[in-house]
Amino acid sequence: MASANALSSASVLCSSRQSKLGGGNQQQGQRVSYNKRTIRRFSVRANVKEIAFDQHSRAALQAGIDKLADCVGLTLGPRGRNVVLDEFGSPKVVNDGVTIARAIELPNAMENAGAALIREVASKTNDSAGDGTTTASILAREIIKHGLLSVTSGANPVSLKRGIDKTVQGLIEELQKKARPVKGRDDIRAVASISAGNDDLIGSMIADAIDKVGPDGVLSIESSSSFETTVEVEEGMEIDRGYISPQFVTNPEKLLAEFENARVLITDQKITAIKDIIPILEKTTQLRAPLLIIAEDVTGEALATLVVNKLRGVLNVVAVKAPGFGERRKAMLQDIAILTGAEYLAMDMSLLVENATIDQLGIARKVTISKDSTTLIADAASKDELQARIAQLKKELFETDSVYDSEKLAERIAKLSGGVAVIKVGAATETELEDRKLRIEDAKNATFAAIEEGIVPGGGAALVHLSTVIPAIKETFEDADERLGADIVQKALLSPAALIAQNAGVEGEVVVEKIMFSDWENGYNAMTDTYENLFEAGVIDPAKVTRCALQNAASVAGMVLTTQAIVVDKPKPKAPAAAAPEGLMV
């Protein structure tokens, strides 16, 4: 039967041509020959392309790069201007370089390819440092502009790129030597204020938040329903699981279960039989200590007995489900165990709940449990063990490539090391709210970058001072085109400071020349129109932001300089509009 079905199916699939060819065979014994197969050919047709070579391709790229960089450059410095973006809904007024870059699409496909390269610079800098996107865009534009002029004049683009890369590497080493570590709250406030567009209120707010949660803490930014911007600090470790039963509530008005100096039992096992935890319940009752049970689940007889005895006043207990899932659940339970000084009773290690002793319980100074969350405030039993755990998580954070894993690891580090600060941003209008949130996000990122790698003079002064080191770096190059690459970087380093001065209404070249012949700490303060010690004036930038801007600009510029052709989709001609019906006025 199966073969008959197979035959009938195959017969249906035969083409008409096969039927004709096999006609004679069918008459002789009704046999069908499948030796000849129809080969179905298919082809993939690409869109029509437009191709440009040499000078024409370079000119198109440069035009697109200039348009985007000019628009982004308007925002640079304390006296930079805003840009209005007409997007969905009401227009946005923004001062953030990467937001502007991402919003720009040029109608000419070849020019848009150039603009896309600057978008890449801005995005990469934003991802790696969180700020400095405008500086990176301006640096990239200048390196590309001078580099393309040299290529047109006959320089070898590969040698130029090699010279640029070597020079940038030497500058980064010099930058790391010159960077100064962050010294206290004033430096943090100054970095945050500068990054937020010289907004001292935002700078003070970021400094206050970091004072409370520490350098390993997490700053989260949310919209507020009021006009005011406030900082709220969530002290201790918070997990996103609440009490299993509302009968555990101790504060009926707020629907919270609140304990002080509670013992903590931590396990990944499911507790269903009350006999498994009777020894622990008896011990904690004798100690007159409340008990917090964090387990995979507490159900059946165990839950019913706990609830009944809680209502009768015999037990002071609350049960909470373990947070997370799978391997992440185990890791989070281990974090809680280290924080409270408990022993993690893991099933795979044969540490059963029924064999638990009072010494395996942790202690939480304060526990607050709602229906959705649990907050634990504890003094770590072993500071060394806690620091080792934080160091391990930092190592994992450094090695991971996953954005999701990075967020979760940073969250766990914050919970172990101090807490989470939430900045609730308020404003009078939606447009102002969006701009304010972007500024605070930049300030937050710049602050953590400064804590990580130190600070340098702001206002583009650090780049101008670094340009004076290039002649010494250039002397080590034997190839003439590589030395030309070093000269290109030297010219480009002057552009951010010149543009900041220009946006402040001052002649850029004059400012750059004065900075160049001053000490490392000195530069031009565009806000006050004075030349002064920028560290003392609070005009400082994170060294990491400067480094990432320079590296990413050089990387993309090198790719452009070694480009010889552009291939883009040819725009399709628009269909003519339909003629209006006769007698109808349009």
Curated annotation (Swiss-Prot):
**Pfam families noted in UniProt:** Cpn60_TCP1
Under which name does UniProt file this protein?
Chaperonin 60 subunit alpha 1, chloroplastic
Q: What else is known?
A: Assisted protein folding requires ATP hydrolysis, but not K(+) ions.
Q: Which cell locations does it reside in? A: Plastid, Chloroplast
Q: Which gene encodes it?
A: CPN60A1
Entry's transmembrane regions: none
Tissue pattern of expression reads:
Expressed in leaves, stems, siliques and flowers.
Q: Which CDD domains match?
A: GroEL
Q: What is its main location?
A: plastid
Tell me its family.
Belongs to the chaperonin (HSP60) family.
Which residues get modified to Phosphoserine?
90
Q: Which InterPro entries match?
A: Chaperonin_Cpn60_CS, Cpn60/GroEL, Cpn60/GroEL/TCP-1, GroEL-like_apical_dom_sf, GROEL-like_equatorial_sf, TCP-1-like_intermed_sf
What upregulates it? Up-regulated by light.
Query: Care to name a GO molecular-function term for this sequence?
Result: ATP binding
State the oligomer form and interacting partners: Part of the Cpn60 complex composed of 7 alpha and 7 beta subunits. This complex shows ATPase activity. The Cpn60 complex interacts with the Cpn10 complex.
